[in-house]
């Protein structure tokens, strides 16, 4: 058996949580491989909306094992809150949730460093979620970090104190005023660490290796989106981990030859949270409609998402970098009501028309070139069969498939798991 990947192909918020939830019944194991509580994976079913930040999106299926991989960074405080929020739903967490010992811990001082760093940048802010993600990954690559496995050691508190002393020295060097009570934050942190200790801690690379040998079906769940990748995203307006397909190998400890299908998810339009270039962004009534109808507000921060037409140049780039083999189109229902739809098929860049993503896509450097397609007005939310979709929508899908040269296997027409059309 192989490990299939599920990746976001835009700037995050594509709807990965819902699709993982839909796909879970076909897999034995769901594994998160990067990111942290800056992710907000939203699932809706039985009239209830759930938002997961650290726990994999397969947790609501009683037969699936869910793994938080070594590439993830975990804030014990936020993890405990997620556990508490799931308590009323009788989710079998202790049996079905496994955590890699090699996953790094987000400390309270990481969040403080994140806030101080962002505040010190003034107008050059990158739009951090202020969850401590960046500073934690910096400690990881700087070989200073604490890992989940360290909480099992007798000297964990001494290791913690050694690192936080360094953090406090760094905080003192920032010329910004960050108000905090570290004793209160630490009390909450160590209480949450006790909860974390109560879960099954594993060597996830060995666990997954044995699972593959036994023929288990595994789905690797990414967070954020490909255009936020630390290497291939719109740097520096990116996250601190590898969100593309390669990140699954390093974030779980699986070999490249073990990768099977690479499923890429994208919205029928484009959104972005926070700062950074966005060539197809809309500032008119069309953009406002996408925001309101699509409920485009961040699941983690509550921030309003910027909205714009689908950018095929950026989408093709994401498909190429990860070797996507099949596509899932989300939120087709949000585009109902537009007379005309626009799709960016190329950029004007330095006086030339190009169809690839250049080094710098700041708004002053690229102008989107659009192809127009006919819109539709039919309400899609109760449609269950692809043949019942309006012709204008199937024409839209056909156009995208031709441009991307990858099949679109699923079209989502609403937030609930039942509002999913498979071709």
Question: What are these model-predicted stretches?
Answer:
Residues 1-423:
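Non-transmembrane, aqueous-exposed alpha-helical and coiled segments at domain scale
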């Amino acid at each position: 058996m192989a490990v299939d990947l599920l990746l976001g192909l835009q700037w995050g918020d594509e709807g990965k949580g819902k699709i993982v939830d839909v796909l879970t019944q076909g897999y034995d194991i769901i594994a998160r491989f990067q990111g942290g509580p800056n992710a907000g994976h939203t699932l809706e079913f039985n009239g209830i909306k759930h938002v997961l930040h650290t726990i994999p999106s397969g947790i609501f299926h009683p037969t699936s094992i869910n793994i938080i991989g070594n590439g993830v960074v975990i804030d014990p405080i936020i993890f405990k809150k997620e556990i508490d929020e799931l308590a009323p739903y009788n989710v079998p967490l202790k049996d079905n949730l496994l955590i890699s010992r090699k996953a790094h811990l987000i400390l309270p001082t990481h969040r403080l460093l994140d806030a101080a760093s962002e505040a010190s940048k003034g107008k050059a802010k990158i739009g951090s979620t202020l969850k401590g993600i960046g500073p934690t990954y910096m400690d990881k690559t700087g070989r200073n970090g604490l890992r989940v496995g360290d909480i099992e050691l007798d000297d964990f508190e001494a290791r913690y104190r050694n690192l936080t002393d360094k953090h406090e020295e760094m905080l003192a060097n920032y010329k910004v005023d960050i108000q905090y009570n570290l004793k209160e934050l630490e009390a909450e942190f160590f209480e949450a660490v006790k909860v974390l200790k109560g879960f099954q801690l594993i060597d996830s690379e060995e666990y997954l290796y044995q699972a593959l040998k036994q023929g288990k079906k595994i789905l690797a769940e990414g967070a954020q989106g490909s255009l936020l990748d630390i290497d291939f995203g719109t740097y520096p307006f990116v996250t601190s981990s590898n969100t593309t397909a390669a990140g699954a190998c390093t974030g779980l400890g699986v070999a490249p030859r073990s990768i099977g299908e690479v499923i890429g998810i994208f919205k029928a339009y484009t959104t972005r949270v926070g700062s950074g270039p966005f060539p197809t962004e809309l500032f008119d009534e069309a953009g406002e409609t996408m925001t309101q109808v699509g409920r485009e507000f961040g699941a983690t921060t509550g921030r309003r998402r910027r909205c714009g037409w689908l950018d095929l140049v950026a989408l093709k780039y994401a498909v190429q970098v990860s070797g996507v083999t099949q596509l899932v189109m989300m939120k087709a229902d949000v585009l109902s009501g537009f007379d005309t739809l626009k799709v960016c098929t190329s950029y004007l860049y330095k006086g030339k028309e190009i169809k690839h993503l250049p080094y710098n896509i700041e708004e002053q450097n690229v102008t989107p070139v659009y192809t127009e397609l006919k819109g539709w007005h039919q309400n899609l939310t109760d449609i269950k069969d692809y043949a019942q979709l309006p012709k204008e929508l199937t024409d839209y899908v056909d156009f995208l498939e031709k441009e991307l040269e990858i099949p679109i296997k699923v079209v989502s027409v609403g937030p609930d798991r039942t509002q999913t059309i498979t071709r």
